[in-house]
Amino acid sequence: MTQNKQGVVQSIAGPAVIADGMYGAKMYDIVRVGRERLVGEIIRLDGNTAFVQVYEDTSGLTVGEPVETTNLPLSVELGPGMLNGIYDGIQRPLDKIREASGDFIARGIEVSSLDRTKKWAFTPSVQPGDTVVGSGILGTVPEFSFTHKILTPPDKGGKLRWVAAAGEYTIDDTIAELEDGTKLRLAHYWPVRAPRPVQKKLDPSLPFLTGMRILDVLFPLVMGGAAAIPGPFGSGKTVTQQSVAKYGNADIVVYVGCGERGNEMTDVLVEFPELVDPKTGGPLMHRTILIANTSNMPVAAREASVYTGITLAEYFRDQGYSVSLMADSTSRWAEALREISSRLEEMPAEEGYPPYLGAKLAAFYERAGAVKTLSGDDGAVSVIGAVSPAGGDMSEPVTQATLRITGAFWRLDAGLARRRHFPAINWNGSYSLFTPILDKWYRQNVGPDFPELRQRITNLLQQEAALQEVVQLVGPDALQDNERLIIETGRMLRQDFLQQNGFDPVDASASMPKNYGLMKMFLKFYDEADLALKNGSTIDEIIQNPVIEKLARARYTPENEFAAYGEGVMDQLSTTFKGVKA
């Protein structure tokens, strides 16, 4: 690591430090500030004066202390050993920090991101004389039940002079050498602010299934898409993201707790190790990386944490896997940008946020996508970002900037959350731009009439919402029977289809075949009941029909029993309203 001439601290304003005499320093270089060697990053240069955001508490730092540049950008180490890891915002493992400094993170502490002593069983997939590209696969390492592919750095490639034999190696051992003398290890470094290069971005065509009916049916997300979950405090953003992390169909989960309360991250750290992965039967943590950057940690590290998370996600994407990144919450990240911007005395824009807020958000969300990697594999990163608008005001700058970038908008409703309706996603205020893209997949893999059924359900819910306003004004007795049927069907759809019980082992997650079966049941009920009304039945007779209870219980039926249960309910629906006359 080349060391340049030291500069000195000129002024300190919270996490922002101005250093003079920084000859040879570059933008985004990592620096060590003060005698305690606090980690910082240069975010602006003016001649030999550097503006540094410090990722640790600057209390006690004084003017005149040394500032030393490392000539390296903020980078993460990518290799075996990251899965099941819990890091802070700049990829320092929290368990190692605790061993070194106790319950609180000591300032200036330096710990290795990956275990440098553990030996990994490396199996090469290339031979001397082969040509490898950047992000090319050199071999594999088993990590838990996961096959970790060892990649060349994206900016390195060429003909291989030597490849290590199959055996056990640490991440510092050389496992291959290029003809130009470049030595390749099991791990490599990559700067977090630079997107990892790919051959090309692909048109998304597969759904990212979450296990939540309201999302998978009404507002789907594509594999490689970006979604926003805005909502006021207490509406369930964190719980919704945790549920998607548990039951989503991604191969790898990266969960970034960015500026949220420490108790919420504690819940994740306690719950996730106990969760069983439905794919492997092992712990879910074995395919999860957690980045904990809570609200009481230094503000500047929040800004870095989302870049750290997306870089880890891109690394697994380059191995040909699908990755989901949960960012909770991007509002806290934007607040960190605002604080740093104000410390640097930049001109503020709306609500004090910097004018480049939209560009920064776009630079983050646009690193999502389905791609063809440099080595020819298909991979994807799906980003789901929570937004916490103050007081639930959706017109504030972070929400509006996020809306312009993301393709799915899952609006959380405090009223639904208070009524214990989970997930508390407002079906009349949410949307997905990916629905037309996925219609073909749904027709081929779920049901040929799936898009039409979804449209009918959407129409019924909208009609029910309009009729509820009438009911609140004049009462239900003023409605005709067919309108009361719409209200009853809407209630059933809300309570027995869109709502899920997160504590129930069966209902916490639902497959698409089961969702399709439920959709057909509820619409069959509406069609048969509507026909019965036309034949002279009354709405009271229909509401008291015992088949409604069976429809309500359908979502709690296990997947392996659902087909038979659904068939029985459909048969009963065909006969139960026949011959019922007024």
From Swiss-Prot:
Domain of life: Bacteria
Record has Cell membrane as a keyword: no
Catalytic reactions of this protein: ATP + H2O + 4 H(+)(in) = ADP + phosphate + 5 H(+)(out)
Residues annotated to bind ATP: G231, P232, F233, G234, S235, G236, K237, T238
EC class name: translocase
Keyword Cell division set for record: no
Keyword terms, alphabetized: ATP synthesis, ATP-binding, Hydrogen ion transport, Ion transport, Nucleotide-binding, Translocase, Transport
Transmembrane segments annotated in the record for this chain: none
UniProt cross-references to InterPro entries, sorted A to Z: ATP-synt_VA_C (IPR055190), ATP-synth_a_Xtn (IPR031686), ATP_synth_asu-like_sf (IPR023366), ATPase_a/bsu_AS (IPR020003), ATPase_F1/V1/A1_a/bsu_N (IPR004100), ATPase_F1/V1/A1_a/bsu_N_sf (IPR036121), ATPase_F1/V1/A1_a/bsu_nucl-bd (IPR000194), ATPase_F1/V1_b/a_C (IPR024034)
SUPFAM superfamilies in alphabetical order: C-terminal domain of alpha and beta subunits of F1 ATP synthase (SSF47917), N-terminal domain of alpha and beta subunits of F1 ATP synthase (SSF50615), P-loop containing nucleoside triphosphate hydrolases (SSF52540)
Pfam families xrefs: ATP-synt_ab, ATP-synt_ab_N, ATP-synt_ab_Xtn, ATP-synt_VA_C
Entry GO CC: proton-transporting ATP synthase complex
NCBIfam families xref list: PRK04192.1
Similarity comment: Belongs to the ATPase alpha/beta chains family.
Name of the featured protein: V-type ATP synthase alpha chain
Protein species of origin: Deinococcus deserti (strain DSM 17065 / CIP 109153 / LMG 22923 / VCD115)
Protein encoded by which gene: atpA
